[in-house]
Design a protein with these regions (language model features):
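Conserved C-terminal portion of the radical SAM core fold
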Residues: 10-12, 48-50, 186, 191-203, ...
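Acidic, low-complexity intrinsically disordered segments
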Residues: 1-186, 191-195
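A general structural detector for well-ordered alpha-helical segments in enzyme core domains, enriched
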Residues: 1, 34-37, 60, 64, ...
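Short aromatic-enriched loop/helix-cap "lid" or pocket-rim segments at secondary-structure transitions
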Residues: 113-114, 137, 214-215, 248-249, ...
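Radical SAM [4Fe-4S] cluster-binding motif and immediate context
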Residues: 139-297
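Alpha-helical structural signal in soluble globular domains
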Residues: 3, 7, 67-71, 96, ...
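Radical SAM enzyme core and accessory elements
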Residues: 35, 42-45, 382-507
């Protein structure tokens, strides 16, 4: 939206509207809303709809484009986004559309719309997106409404691109990272803050790449924290784990609890796997920096591991998980490898027997080192780990679940045993109520692991009360519990409560 005037025309900007849908919205409702916004068809006046297409919405967007074309064949459909920027000709949604912008669309989309409306009309269906200097891109932040500021996490970017070449990531196709001019960017952040914005998520792939810029951004938020108006501030950065010089440490250490969240991609501690996928990571520095952040700062650490990388065995992943768990980040996100269109990861398919789903999100199902059944077990484990560990709802009970036992004597395998048991009990990974989950944990620990019932019940009672749930699990039926149903807040409130539960655990 912000660039429709700058790279199109003021009139084009006036004619443009931004519309958002959820994946759950009925198809015909979306079609009706879009066609109503366009109004009736008029001779010699093209009607244009642009779609951002991603791995998570391409199926629904394909259906929507098909329905739009069926009801109004003359509408001009323009596609953009990462999912249609690679392997373009093989996709059904591309065949249904009129134009596709591959790559950056900030400049190319306004220019295309202007050409469609005023001529000369473009001859090519596939348009390579123009990558301008970042100074030529209008920052979009003044487009945010007051409702956006009050109810949403605000996505902001101080830079684009990534200099690293991790083969599973689309950013590996970038030649380098490009930084927006810092002064105008900070001015826009200041305007957002003064309008009431308090929840900022930086989408930079490598926030701590350029230390001078990183330091100025951190200082910007420290300065706001020194005022009385910064209540509720939450800032999320994605950082590379082995690059944390003293200047950044000095600034990070000044933040109070509940403000900083760092997403830290570890992906794998296996050095052979790292080399195979062109990932540069100093494991010793990574571990040292994580331990420093946990002991010397108040940052909340959301760390990532990827299961299924070429050459990673189940045992080597388990060892990496145990190593990361021992370091002690508040959250460990267990991701499953996906073959994103255009990534160099595809070069390993034959040599490592990589088998992926043919439909989005292209999740791996088996390879030469890990069979299909093990992938299915791990998929369940990852979902249960998020429910039990990452949620912070079982901080008293989790150590019992993770107690290593024969035959593997490993926290990873201990949780795998729990996940297998939970699956046998419930046959589901979604839709588990807090009460059903508490009862399943109780059954596992007392029946399968033979822990003393009184001890387990005591831990579960503390966890259940601290979680804010208000039901009555069967195993706690004789305890004094408040009633009224679980409290559900906004996503921002839930994120804050999740961090608070982890913060309490560290006290």
């Amino acid at each position: 939206m912000a660039n429709m005037a700058r790279h199109g025309s003021p009139k084009l900007a006036e004619l443009t509207a931004l519309t958002e849908f959820t994946l759950a919205k009925p198809m015909q409702s979306m079609v009706h809303e879009l066609l109503s916004q366009l109004g009736p068809e008029l001779p010699d006046r093209p009607q244009i709809i642009g779609f951002g297409v991603y791995i998570w919405n391409v199926i629904q967007t394909t259906e929507l484009v098909r329905a739009l074309k069926a009801q109004r064949p003359g509408v001009v459909v323009v596609l953009g986004g990462p999912e249609v920027s690679h392997e373009i000709d093989s996709q059904e949604i591309v065949h249904l559309s009129d134009h596709v912008i591959s790559g950056w669309g900030d400049v190319s989309f306004p220019k295309l719309c202007l050409a469609l409306l005023q001529g000369p009309k473009p001859l090519m269906k596939i348009i390579q997106g123009e990558q301008p200097p970042l100074s030529d891109i209008e920052l979009p932040y003044r487009e945010f409404s007051d409702a956006d500021l009050a109810n949403r996490v605000l996505y902001v970017e101080a830079s684009r691109g990534c200099p690293f070449k991790c083969e599973f990531c689309l950013s590996s196709l970038d030649k380098t990272a490009w930084a927006f001019d810092l002064n105008p960017f900070l001015q826009e952040l200041d305007i957002l803050f003064n309008r009431g914005a308090r929840n900022f998520k930086f989408v930079d792939r490598t926030f701590n790449l350029k230390i001078e810029a990183s330091a100025q951004i951190l200082q910007f938020f420290l300065d706001r924290l020194a005022t009385d108006s910064a209540q509720g501030l939450l800032v999320h950065f994605e950082v590379i784990p082995d690059h944390l010089p003293d200047r950044l440490k000095e600034l990070i250490s000044q933040f109070p609890p509940g403000v900083l969240q760092f997403e830290v991609g570890i992906q794998s501690f296996n050095e052979e796997v790292q080399q195979r996928i062109s990932r540069r990571q100093d494991n010793a520095k990574t571990e040292a920096n994580l331990r420093w952040l946990l002991t010397e700062s108040n940052a909340h650490l959301h760390t990532d591991l990827i299961f299924g990388l070429p050459g990673e065995t189940l045992q080597s992943f388990a060892e990496g998980f145990d190593r990361l768990l021992n370091i002690g980040p508040q959250e460990i996100q267990l991701g499953i490898l996906k073959l994103l269109r255009g990534t160099p990861l595809a070069r390993h398919t034959q040599a490592h027997g990589m088998v992926y789903d043919s439909q989005p999100p292209y999740v791996i199902r088996q390879n030469n080192d890990i069979d299909k059944e093990s992938f299915e077990r791990f998929t369940r484990l990852a979902k249960y780990w998020d429910l039990v560990a990452n949620s912070g709802r079982f901080k008293q009970t989790l150590p019992l679940i993770l107690q290593a036992h024969a035959p593997h004597h490993s926290p990873f395998w201990a949780f795998m045993s729990f996940a297998d048991d939970l699956w046998q009990q419930t046959q589901k990974t979604y839709g588990l109520t807090p009460e059903a989950l508490v009862d399943a944990v109780f059954t596992y620990l007392t029946v399968s692991r033979l822990f003393e019932e009184t001890q387990v019940r005591q831990f579960l009672l503390k966890d259940y009360l601290a979680s804010g749930a208000r039901g009555r699990p069967m195993c706690l039926a004789h305890e004094n519990l408040p009633l009224g149903g679980e409290r559900l807040g906004s996503s921002q409130q839930n994120l804050r409560e999740r961090q608070d539960r982890h913060a309490d655990l560290q006290k």
